[in-house]
Amino acid sequence: MFTAADLKLNGRLRQAAMHNAKAVKSTYPLVSMVDLNVVRERMSSSIISDVLDGMGLRGQAMSVDVRPLSEDMSTVGTAFTMLMADQYDEGKDTFTLQFQAIDSLGKDNVMVICSNGSDRAALWGELLSTAATYRGAAGAVIDGLARDVSLIKKMGFPVF
């Protein structure tokens, strides 16, 4: 059963999304209008999906290939995106830009890494999860390999 507060939040989500659709430059106006803690505690992905569908924004679900490391993992936050590409020159530093991205994470950011499904190396592991947790990040979504899965599960850091 929805409470009046839930319905009010639903309206605020719709208002924020419409505002954001007009000012596509940043997702931060959307986040500033919605309390992410309330979304975490009271909203399910089905409610958010229904709101987006009602606004004509269909197909906003993640690919069936993107799954949580553990079924009890979920996350809510602002996307912090990174594009990665396979590197074939083994003599070059491969981590500087990735570390800079992790160092730039902030509270409630969700690191979203696109690698076009590369299977050459793990994109995420325990060290990055630890660094992201320290910076207040809310999770990570990757379209490639993850390592140190048992350690990440013990940490409880949401990785998809």
Question: PLM ranges: what are they?
Answer:
Residues 44-51, 78, 97, 101, ...:
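General structural feature for long, well-ordered alpha-helical segments within catalytic domains
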